[in-house]
Regions:
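C-terminal, well-structured catalytic/ligand-binding subdomain of enzymes
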Residues: 1-162
């Protein structure tokens, strides 16, 4: 999927254009991709190798698509619980921006289950109107400009990682 996302970033201006690309480009595995453009239009593409992509107006995506197909994986990753948590925060609570973003670095959204093959590496915060983004880890934030991107590297200690 990295090549597909790179293509989308280089060729699409809007969420709609990105959705059209994601709907037609084949993928070797199932992926959920949520897209946001400068005008705050968004969509989620549920892509899979064995069926046509489904483009939705969902504002969130976790580790399952429309229905849970792999129950043990869903339990292990808490995909349904994380989706419900996010939807509840968006629809019912209207948290201030920093509180909402901070929730991505705490359970149930943040996981340190690296030894079991599932952990959160980082959280990305995108601000398309400002042409800015941040990568966040517990205790560390790396702010980046999308208008004047400067390549760089960071060494971060990820809690729970080997």
């Amino acid at each position: 999927v990295p090549l597909i996302l790179r293509y989308v970033l280089q060729t699409c201006e809007t969420a709609q254009e990105a959705g059209e690309v994601l709907a037609r480009v084949p993928t070797h595995m199932s992926y959920n991709v949520t897209v946001l453009d400068r005008k705050r239009r968004y969509l989620t593409a549920m892509m899979a190798p064995d069926r046509p992509a489904v483009i939705t107006r969902a504002a969130v995506a976790t580790n399952h698509q429309e229905n849970v197909e792999w129950i043990s994986h869903a339990r292990f990753t808490a995909t349904v619980e994380r989706e419900r948590y996010l939807l509840q925060r968006l629809r019912l609570h209207r948290d201030p921006e920093e509180k909402f973003i901070g929730a991505f670095l705490k359970p149930p959204l943040y996981s340190t289950a690296f030894n079991a093959g599932f952990g959160t590496l980082y959280t990305a915060v995108y601000r398309p109107r400002k042409r800015e983004m941040e990568l966040r880890w517990p205790g560390t934030t790396w702010a980046l400009s999308l208008s004047d991107f400067t390549e760089g590297a960071r060494q971060v200690l990820v809690p729970g990682a080997a």
